[in-house]
Amino acid sequence: MKTLIVYSSQTGNTQKMAEAVNGLISGEKTLCPVDKAPDPAGFDLVVLGFWLMGGKPDPKSSNYLAKVGDANLFLFATHGAAAGSAHAIKAMAHAKSLAPSAQIAGTFSCPGEVSPTFLEKALKKDPPPPWIGDAPAAAGHPDSTDIAHLAEAVKAALPALAA
């Protein structure tokens, strides 16, 4: 299987998760930041990791999602919100909507530590972003448990691709 693993990361959280996926998947694979990502055509699976900005995938990832066409797509996100929060769920739904023809193989999201500089800016907003109350609990994430859960989600998606 030929896999393209693309990520956008500002603080290293999403890159860390993308590198874990790269270590998990066998076969021919390419790992690269979104701004250096090749055309996704010709890959059996595209894995895209992104961070959230305003409750949506970051702008570079949003632009890349428009290019995936009907590819098999696995999406994952890191964010300051709690895992399973309405904010995270809505953001993932928005990500899917940016690639309407893609075959969604699976999704995953988890908290990611928010940089102190960004957190300081977010605290000054009126109203504050919906994830701000969850941000302290995101410290130290993604951690080994988050990576293990991502690995489970990816492994669960792979058999569906072989069918």
Regions found by a protein language model. Give the residues of each.
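Structured loop/turn residues at beta-strand edges in well-structured enzyme cores
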Residues: M1, A41, A102
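N-terminal beta1-alpha1 ligand-phosphate binding loop
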Residues: K2-L24
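Generic structural signal for beta-strand residues in well-ordered domains
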Residues: Y7, P38-P40, A66, S97
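FMN-binding flavodoxin-like domain, especially the glycine-rich phosphate-binding loop
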Residues: G23-T30, L45-L48, M53-A163
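Short acidic low-complexity segments
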Residues: T30-G42
